[in-house]
Amino acid sequence: MTDWKTTITPEERNGNSIKILDFLMQWYPNFNRAEALVRANTLEDRIFNTPGIISKNDYIERIAKKIYAIGESLEAKKAQAGMTNNPQTPNPMPTTPITPLIQQPITPVQQQVPPQKQPQPVYNQQQNQQQNQNQYTTTYPSPNTPQQSNTPPISNNNSNNNSNNNLNNNNNNNINNNNNNNNNNNNNNNNNNNNNNNNNNNNNNNNNNTVYAQPLTPQQQIQQQQHQQHQLYLQQQQQLQRLAQQNQQQQPTIMQQVQNQQPTQQQQQQQQQQQQQQQQQQLNQQQINQIKQQQQQQQQQQQQHQQPVQMPSGVTTNKQSPQPQNTPLTPQQQQQLLAAQQSHAQAQANQNQQLQNPKRISSTNNTHLMPCLPSTLYPTATQQDINNMYWERVSSIKKYIPEIEAIIPKIIENFSQSQNQQPQKVETYKKKFLDFVQMVKVTPETVVPPLNLDELTNAERYLMNMYLSSLSEEEQFKKILGTIDDRSNDNLIHFEKDLLNAFERTKRYFSDTFLNKTGGVTSKAPSILWFKNPALNNPFTSATKCQFSDPIVPKKKQHILLDSWTPEFKKIKKGNYEIFEKDQKIYNNLKKDLIDFTKNDNTLLPAKFIDKDTIIISETINGGDGGNNLYIHFNQCQFSTSWKGSKKNPAMFVCSSPNIQISSDGELFSIQPLCGLSWDRAEIIIKHYKQSLNRGDLISKELSQVISLNRYTIESHLDLENAKFFIQFSTKSTLLLKSKKQQQQQQDEKINNNNNNFYNLSILLEVPNNYPYSPISYSFPPEYQLTPYLKDLESKMNKEFENSNDLNQLNNNINNNNNNNNSFSDNTQLPTNQSIVESLKIFEKVLKDLV
């Protein structure tokens, strides 16, 4: 925690507090700025000390999310306040949550109160009437349908609609004018009086106007009744949501907790706020009881009155319409009507249960009540499960939206330029991107039900594929490691099992050679990583021994014994096994020949067995633990574990016979030439063993001479695959090298000062297997070819070595002539003049010319 906190300066923290302050002052400009700054500082300090933050970026992201959440909550309040028609003015920041009141039914006592202020306009009434009429006309017959001549006139009955509109207007006025209770009551009374006058006028007009209409069929009556019940249910549900938001706001918030920590001057204000909250809770309880009474009254009225019928336009008379005749219902229609009444009664029971527990309802729980379309990806999931998965996917991908929006222009540009697409296709491609982004950026307040989980999943896959394909391999691995770091220990165990199972699946599609060359297979998804089997915890037989007592074994449909023992001959094809049997016979015979040959050689001790498959050969004089003893190991099977070698040095494989390994107690370069031999005869092996010991003694003497000069640092390199031995000599002091041009322009001091180059030069000498009878070869590091000064060094070294080789060839010719005259054998050979020390002398001579 302290590591990332130290990277944040006080100026940055103050800047974040000022951002929160400016955001709050935009909504509440009349509030005291000093007090708002205290609240902003407290909010920033709380985010800074949150235990879940692990980095500076996480802290900045939490600040941004908090500002975004504050903005959403304030916009929601603004949208709720916008439902009323009062002029919107910037309100001061509330110290306590404001609880709107639901308009009580108008009583004669309220109508007699004299008004104290100008009545507010009630133009919402006409709008609500039009909306209600439009809603009802959607399920009624068209006004242009033909009329029957014998249909009696029916009076237009709109009293229920007008009363509902008046109730809605009174509720809206009461919600907006909650802060001034006395004045608002007067205004409400005035509005109620005006509404009553309008209702009277409407009723008079309705009584004077009569129209002709068709009688409703039983099915239309059922549909009309269900529609009215649904509208009434929606109105009551909105009132319940408002009450729930009020009760939720009355609980202690972050701002109130900060005020509790202020000096004693604010304690009096807190007591007043608590009293106001208690009064508001009592008023809310009264309003809940009134809603229950209204529901019962409306239910009784619906049973008494007949369903309203839409009136065709253009037909009016002054006669009063008689009551329509009740047509008998069929048994099927009676069952439908009974089912509709039962569903309405069930909705009323659920609503009453919510009224009894209003505090349990919150705006966040409304997301669980949203209808969802059935998912083809999860056919057995319930509505609640689909709803939860929908919002979990939205929250998981929202953190990538800023990065995705940043790369959208680049992706669209590449799409238009690569294939020269038409502008219409490019716009369609761009619109698809933006639609998917908007689909993911939804909130519970902005989403349009029903929720479609399949559509959201397709959008998520499309955006994530485009986003991950735009990342480099390094960024992909960083995200993979980031997801691993964020997981807990328990999740990492499941994560490890998934990785091992994933690798086991890849072996079905990728060969072992491919996996060994590439080192593994990676996936672009941030939560999947396919890799080569690690040696730490690997349950497969081809891996090293597992360090845990109970290794993780991947489960499949059929049980597979991965660690069960099987004979080696079953793993080898028939042709290969026959070759292996022949080789084993040769090795067994060679082992016996070596033991018999050492018994007859006076310079060597008789070979003896260390274990069943290993023998040791030693010199008579220098034998022992410190000598150049030769260890020979014969593998009995083609798939055995590698031999570790002697106590001091590791084992080396024989190139021609991979089932034979050798090692020594002395320097490995003393027996290195034996790796390049063909091990078929014991006599040849013992002969080359003695020559390699002489070679090793000569190399050790020459290296001791070079070390005594104290001019070079020496490093030896043993190439076991190709059976070669290299020695690298590097100068200890830096040398000033000059090119040919610099040597010609030594009089010009400026050029010498600017172009001088100092180097620690190195030369790599390869010692042949039959040294000293073959000359030393040299090479330079490959980077020397890039420098012009070192190219001159290489060209001069080549000339000197050619001259030395010519001299060596001349000596060999003279030696051959002498051997022929003296009848010596052809196998006699003189040592070469180009030794390790002579090669270094040539190297120093060339350096003097360049320095």
Curated annotation (Swiss-Prot):
Keyword terms, alphabetized: Activator, Coiled coil, Cytoplasm, Nucleus, Transcription, Transcription regulation
Coiled-coil segments on the chain, per record: 231-307, 790-827
GO BP terms: transcription by RNA polymerase II
Composition-biased stretches (Low complexity): 98-141, 155-212, 320-358
Cellular localisation: Cytoplasm; Nucleus
GO cellular component labels: cytoplasm; nucleus
Region (Disordered): 79-212, 299-368
Principal location listed in the UniProt entry: cytoplasm
Comp. bias intervals (Polar residues): 145-154, 308-319, 359-368
GO molecular function, a single term: histone acetyltransferase activity
Similarity annotation: Belongs to the Mediator complex subunit 15 family.
Functional summary from the UniProt entry: Component of the Mediator complex, a coactivator involved in the regulated transcription of nearly all RNA polymerase II-dependent genes. Mediator functions as a bridge to convey information from gene-specific regulatory proteins to the basal RNA polymerase II transcription machinery. Mediator is recruited to promoters by direct interactions with regulatory proteins and serves as a scaffold for the assembly of a functional preinitiation complex with RNA polymerase II and the general transcription factors.
Self-association state and partner proteins as the record states: Component of the Mediator complex.
Protein name: Putative mediator of RNA polymerase II transcription subunit 15
Higher taxonomy: Eukaryota, Amoebozoa, Evosea, Eumycetozoa, Dictyostelia
